[in-house]
Amino acid sequence: MAERVSLVFHNKMIDGTAIKRLISRLIDHFGMAYTSHILDQVKTLGFQQATATSISLGIDDLLTIPSKRWLVQDAEQQSFILEKHYHYGNVHAIEKLRQSIEIWYATSEYLRQEMNPNFRMTEPFNPVHIMSFSGARGNASQVHQLVGMRGLMSDPQGQMIDLPIQSNLREGLSLTEYIISCYGARKGVVDTAVRTSDAGYLTRRLVEVVQHIIVRRTDCGTVRGISVSPQNQNRMMSERVFSQTLIGRVLADDIYMGQRSIAIRNQDIGIGLVNRLITLRTQAISIRTPFTCRSTSWICRLCYGRSPTHGDLVELGEAVGIIAGQSIGEPGTQLTLRTFHTGGVFTGGTAEHVRAPSNGKIKFNEDLVHPTRTRHGHPAFLCSIDLDVIIEGEDIMHNVTIPPKSFLLVQNDQYVESEQVIAEIRAGAYTLNFKERVRKHIYSDSEGEMHWSTDVYHAPEFTYSNVHLLPKTSHLWILSGGSRRSSVVSFSLHKDQDQMNIHSLSVERREISSLSLSVNNDQTGHKFFSSDFSAKKKGRILEMSDYSGFNRIISTGHCNLIHPAILHANSDLLAKRQRNGFLIPFHSIQEQEKELMPHSGISIEIPVRGIFRRNSILAYFDDPRYRRKSSGITKWGTLGAHSIVKKEDLIEYRGLKKIKPKYQMKIDRLFFIPEEVHIFPESSYLMVRNNSIIGVDTQITLNIRSRVGGLVRMERKRGGVELKIFSGDIHFPGEIDKISRHSGILIPPESEKTKLKEATKESKKLKKWIYVQRITPTKKKSFVLVRPVVTYEIANGINLATLFPQDPLREKDNMQFRVVNYVLYGKGKAAGGISDTSLQLVRTCLVLNWDQDNKSSSVEEVCASFVEVRTNGLIRNFLRINLVKSNISYLRKRDHPSGSGLISDNGSARTNSNPFYSVFGKAGVEQSLRQNQGTIRTLLNKNKECQVLIILSSSNYFRMGPLNDVKYHNVIKQSIPIQKDSLTPIKTSLGPLGTFLQIANFYSFYYLITHNHISVTKYLKLDNLKQPFQVLKYYLMDETGEIYNPDTDSKILLNPFNLNWYFLQPNYCEEMSPIISLGQFLCENVRITKRGPYLKSGQVLIVQVNSVVIRSAKPYLATPGATVHGHYGAILYEGDTLVTFIYEKSRSGDITQGLPKVEQVLEVRSLDSISMNLEKRVEGWNASITRILGIPWGFLIGAELTIVQSRISLVNKIQKVYRSQGVQIHNRHIEIIVRQITSKVLVSEDGMSNIFLPGELIGLLRAERMGRALEEVICYRAILLGITRASLNTQSFISEASFQETTRVLAKAALRGRIDWLKGLKENVVLGGIIPVGTGFKGLVHCSRQHNNILLERQKGNLFGGEMRDIFLHHRELFDSCISTTFHDTSEHNCLEGLMSPRSEFF
C-alpha cells in the first residue's frame, strides 16, 4: 500500500481505444484472472454512478432540431429545380443523380452538425447527449437518425436510392420510407435474405478450390522470396500493415545491418523482430510466401509460416487450404448482417469550395482555362495549372490562387459578392481509391421514334450493331407516337406516310357467329366480320364479296363527277375504307333509306394516298339489271377471258398466296342458274329431308319458309348445315350413260329435237336456255334435274374520249378512261347470299390509263383529289386527277445504315416488303389500329422491310399560336395570266411529312402554277373557289430546309415533277425573333418570339402564318463517351434502353458492396464496365519481352512476370475490400486461394510442341519441368481462372464432379481415362476413406533434396529483381546458351535494368 503514493493520477476521459489499451497492458502485467477482477470493479463503479445520476432514456429525451423544417424545404426546392432542368434536357440522368445525392447529403450533414449545439443550448444533461457525445454508447450517426433525418440509403447492390428518408425515427417513417429502410437497416429484411446465400456460396467455392492443400513437407528448398519494404517511392506503408504482413512469416534471406546479420534465412518473424526492423528502417525484406513454394498440390511449413492458432510453425498434416477458404468466406457471412447500427445510411463526401473574400469584379487570364461541364452539368472553366484570380473590390484587391484541375464557376469581369462560391477544388488524390467506374443505363419513358442532334460514331467493336458512341454532348430525342407491332395477321389499310381519319376502319378481334359465314368464303379467301351496321340487324351480314367492312359516314356533301356520262344526280357522299383506298358510292337518298349500302350507283374508288397507278380502277357502276335477289351459279360461254389481277388483290396468309381474279369479258352472255340457299347451325331442327321435293312456302324450320319449290339438297359444312333448294323439272331417263354425257351442261333454245328428246323426253321446243344436272341419291335411282337459266347480255368495254385537251408541252401524257365489265364470280362457282340479301353479278368499271402509246413516259402515277367549285350559288364537286412526273421519293434525314435511304413510291421497295397485308384468317382480324386522327409512318429495319407502324395521334401534337410578331417582307407576288374561260387547276396541299391528306381533310386554297391547263368553257369563274372542309393550312419541308408560309394572296412556285417545294426567300424580321425551320427540335421553355408563348419540347411539324405545330418529344441529354442503343429513326418502346453512361462514383463503405467486389476479383470478372486496355498492355509487354530475349525466354519470363504481378494485385484488391470493413484477414489465406487460380497456363499455338495440345490448361510448374526434361520449348501464356473454373480444373475428377456439372465431368474423365490419386480431402470423404490430414496424415515424407545453396550477393531488389533472378537460376542451362557461360552480377544487373523499371509493393 505504500507504493500508492508513487502512482500517477490521470484525470482523463477514457474512450473505447484507451480501455482496450489499458486491458492489454493489465493482462501483460497481471494475467487474465486478476484483470477480469479489475474490470468487474470498473463495471460496478459505472452502474453506481449512473444510478446516482438517475440517467434514464425516455422518448421525450429525443429532442428534434428546430431548423430541420426549412432545411428540408430548401433541399426540396433545389430538387424541384433540378427535376425541371432534367425535363428540359439541360442535365442528364447521372448529373441529376449526383446533384440530388449531394443536395440531400449536405442537408443531412448540416442537420448533424446542428445537433450537438442544439443539445448543448437546450438541455446539456440530456441522457442521449451524455451517452452519445461522451462515446459511452452510440455514436453521432445513430443519434442523428433518431432526432435529425435518416437521409439517403443504399440498396442491396450498394447503389444509392435517390429518394431520401426525410423523417427521423422519433417522428416515425411513412410507408415508402419504411420500405426503403428495410433495404438498409441491420438484419434488414431484404438484405439478410439476399446476402447470406451469396456469402455461403462464396465460402463453398473457395473451399472447393483449395481443399486439397495440406502441409506435407518442412522445406521445399525454394530460393525465391517476395520483398516487402516499409518505405516506398509512392507512399509510406503504415506500421500496422507492415507488421501484419511480416508477423508469422519466414525469412527467405538473411537480413544485414551494415556488416552485421540481424536475422537469418528460414527464421520465423515474431513481434520483437518486426519492432527492431521498423526501428532500424532496414531496406526491403525478402520473405517466403505460398506463392514461392515449389510444390504444386501442397505446401511446406516454411512457406506457410506460423499457424494462426498457437503461434508456432504450422504442423505437418494441417489442412491449411480449408482454413484459408473459410477465413475469407466466413467474414462475408457475418458481415452481411451489417454489424453497425448505422444501417446502410449513405456516407460520402462533398467537394471543397473556394469563396470570394469580398465583393468585387473577377479578373483572370482566359487563355489558361477552357470551358467544360461540372459533374452536376453546370457550365464552368477548367484550369490545368495554378490560376491566379484577382478580385477587384472598391478599395482593395484580393488575389486567390486556384489549384490545377479545379473548376472555376464564374466568368471573367463578373461581379461577385462576398462569400460567393467562385471555384470548386477537385477532391484530392486520396479519394480516388474510393471511386469506381460503373455503368448506368437510361431507359426511355415513352414510346416513339429516336432522333439525335449530332453525328454518332459506331463503337469500334460493334461495327454492325446498333451501339453508337457519342463524340460530343448532344440531345437524344424520343418523338412521341403510339405504335403497333406488326404480326402475321395484320391489317393493311395504311401505307407509309398515310393520314388516318378518326373514323377510319378499326377492326377488332370479334367472335364470328355461324350465321355470318358466307357461301363464297372458299372462293374469296375472306372471312366477313360483323360491322357496326350488322349489329343493328341481328344475324344478318351485308354480303359484299370483296369489301373488308363498313365505315361510318364521313361527310355528306353533293358530289358530281367530271364526265357527264357517269353523272348521278342528287347523290350523297358516303365513303367506305377498303384495303386499297376509299370507296365513295354515289346513290340517291331513297335507296339509302331502303338499304344501308346500295349496289347500284357509281362508286369512286380512291387509294388512301390519292395516287393511282396505270390501269387502276377509278370508279365502278353496279347495274341493277345484273342484280339477283337469290343465290345461284354463274356460267358463261368461253369466247375468251383474261383475268385482271390488281396488286392489292394479292392476299398473303402465312406464306400461302390466294389470288382473287376479276374476269374481264370478251363474251356477250352470262348465265345465272338460281337456287335458294340456307345455312343452319348443326343444332337446328330441320323439318325437311335430304333429296325430298317440296313446294313453295314450305316450312323448313320453325321460323323459315322456302321461297321456291323444288328438290332439297343438304350438305354439311364447317360447323353447320347448308340447305339448297333447286327449282326445276325432274326427269327419269332410261339410259344412265346418256345422262352422264349431258350432265352439268347448258342447252340453248331452238336445238335439235333428237338431242333434246334423249335428255328430256319432250318434243316441244324450248323458249329459254336450260341447265341439265344429274342427281344421284344414295339408294334411289338417278334422275336428271332440268333447271331454269337466267341469261344476261353484256356489252363490251369501250374507251371513253380523252378528258384532257392536248397539252402543248407534253402531248403524250394524257388521261384515258376505259369502261370495262367484269364478272364478280368465277365460272361454275357458287355465288350466294344468305336469306334475302341481293347479289351483283356484273360490275362496270372505269379504268384509268394514260399515254398507252409511249412506253418510255416517266409518269408512273397520278394524284386524285376533290375540288369544290361554286357557281352562282350552286356547288359542284369535281374529282381532279393530276399527273405526277417521276416518283415521289422520301429521303430520310441521314442515310444511316439502319435507315431507308431512298424509298421509291412506284412499288418496288415498298409494296414487296410491306408485311401489312390484308388478311382475314380464321381467327378474325388482329387488333384495331388507332381510332383517332393521325399520320402513319412505316419504319424500316436494316433490310428495308417494314416492321412497325407508328401512328401520330392528335394527342401528340401541341398547337402553339398565334405568333403575331413574325413578319414577312418583300414577298414577290407573281400573277398567273388567267383567261376568262380557263380554269386554273387547284392542287391539294401536302399534309404533314409530305403526304396527301385524305379525302375528308383535303382542302384547296392556294393557286399553283402547273403545266396542265384544263379548259372548261363558260362554266365558272376563278373567284368562286372555296375549300370544302375547314382544316389546318400548313406546308412542310424536309428537316434541313427552310420553311415559309406565304400570305393568302401570294403564289407558290411548285415544280410538279419532283414535289420539292421551293419558297421565295423571305427577309428576316425586324425583330430578332428567329424563323423556325421545319423539323427543328425545340427544348421546353424556349420562346421563339419576344411576346410569344413558352413552347413545349418537340419537333416543329407545321408552321403556319400565325401559329406553329410541334410534335411533342422528350429530350435526353447525353455527354461524350456515352453509348447510344438503337438506330436513328428507330422505334423505341417504353422501358427500352436508350443510352448507357459510364461514370465514376464514390464507393459506399459497406461490406455488402464489398462482397460482390470480392466475388468479382475471385471469379476474375472485369471490374470496369469498359476494359481499360489492360489486356493490350500485357500483350504488348509479352511481345516486347519476346523481342528482347527471343522466343523461349520470352514466353517463359513473360508468363512468369504476368503471373507474379497479377497475384500481387489480386491479393491487394481483396485485402482492400476487407480492410475497408475493418476485417483483418491474414495475407497468407488470400495467397493460398490466389495461388490456385493463377497456377495454370494455356498452351499457345505459337511454338509447335509435341507434348501438349494447343489450348490445353496445364500447371505452370509442370510446364516448366516438362520443358526442362525434354529440352523442348513449350509456348504458353498466363491465364487467370475464376474460382469456379479452377474448381473444375483440378487433378481430381471426383472432386470436380461433386462440385458442379457432375455428368459432364464424369463423362469426360471416362473418355480420357483419367486416374484419381485421391490426394485431396474431398475425394476421400466421397469414397469413405481416411482423409490425409491430422492423424490420417502419412508421415512417410521423402527427405527433400538438398539444393546447392548458390550464394549470391542480394540486390536491393524490388519484387521484379528478386523474381527475375530466380527465374534465371531455374533455367541456368538455357540461359547459358542464350547469353554467356559466365554469370556475373554485372551481366545480370545490365540485363535486368531495361526490364525492371516498374516497382511494386506488396502488403
Swiss-Prot record:
GO BP term, example: DNA-templated transcription
Fetch the SUPFAM superfamilies from UniProt.
beta and beta-prime subunits of DNA dependent RNA-polymerase
Identify the residues that bind Zn(2+).
C220, C293, C300, C303
Q: Which GO terms describe its cellular component?
A: chloroplast; DNA-directed RNA polymerase complex; mitochondrion
Q: Which reaction(s) are listed as its catalytic activity?
A: RNA(n) + a ribonucleoside 5'-triphosphate = RNA(n+1) + diphosphate
**Per the annotation, which location comes first and is thus the protein's main one?**
plastid
**Which organism does this record belong to?**
Citrus sinensis (Sweet orange)
Q: What is its EC number?
A: 2.7.7.6
Top EC class per UniProt?
A: transferase
Q: How does it assemble?
A: In plastids the minimal PEP RNA polymerase catalytic core is composed of four subunits: alpha, beta, beta', and beta''. When a (nuclear-encoded) sigma factor is associated with the core the holoenzyme is formed, which can initiate transcription.
Name used for this protein in its record: DNA-directed RNA polymerase subunit beta''
